[in-house]
Amino acid sequence: MVSSPCTQASSRTCSRILGLSLGTAALFAAGANVALLLPNWDVTYLLRGLLGRHAMLGTGLWGGGLMVLTAAILISLMGWRYGCFSKSGLCRSVLTALLSGGLALLGALICFVTSGVALKDGPFCMFDVSSFNQTQAWKYGYPFKDLHSRNYLYDRSLWNSVCLEPSAAVVWHVSLFSALLCISLLQLLLVVVHVINSLLGLFCSLCEK
């Protein structure tokens, strides 16, 4: 018995939607990471190397961005049966589904972990060292990383009083890394749906033969 056209169409439609959703999320992740490289839209910090290591890693660009976007293109091609996928067999479809799913999973997971660590460590900014060791000096670093007595994420009184430069460094950092965290989480959920859709399509194809 041949596989049902209805089953194949449903699986392909789901792949098209998933590909579009993952691709859109990847573009948003890349955009958020670009913004992290330009605090207050000022390129000076990037040129002077005054950016935190989490932003410089660029996981939103190559992880949640390029890797997920590549997977999204593969998934979309499978859904539209375009090019070499127009008459792809069962083995090729399964291999492509595993490859695209693994690629998107890895990229989204790297971006998710990096964003979580970045939120935990806090922003990279210029702060007054005297408020920590009684020495009058200013330097760039992570003022909230070793501040165990108070959590800056919940104590908003610290947001405008610790970081001297860039202005609104905490708001910029928290907003964009929170966005990256949510985007990568959404990507992970979409990858799970993609894997389930691929397995169901494979199962139905095998059962209906």
UniProtKB/Swiss-Prot annotation:
Keywords for this protein: Cell projection, Cytoplasm, Cytoskeleton, Glycoprotein, Lysosome, Membrane, Transmembrane, Transmembrane helix
Gene Ontology molecular function: protein homodimerization activity
Residue pairs linked by disulfide bridges in the UniProt entry: none
UniProt topology in membrane: Multi-pass membrane protein
TM stretches of this protein: 17-37, 60-80, 94-114, 176-196
Cytoplasmic side: 1-16, 81-93, 197-209
InterPro entries linked to this entry: L6_membrane
Extracellular topological domain residue ranges: 38-59, 115-175
Region (Important for homodimerization): 186-196
Tissue specificity annotation: In adipose tissue, expressed by macrophages.
Inducing factors: Up-regulated by bacterial lipopolysaccharide (LPS) in human umbilical vein endothelial cells (HUVECs).
Glycosylation site positions: 133
Family designation: Belongs to the L6 tetraspanin family.
Subunit structure: May form homodimers and homooligomers. Interacts with integrins ITGAV and ITGB3. Interacts with components of members of the V0 complex of vacuolar(H+)-ATPase (V-ATPase), including ATP6V0B and ATP6V0D2; this interaction inhibits V1-V0 complex assembly.
Name of the featured protein: Transmembrane 4 L6 family member 19
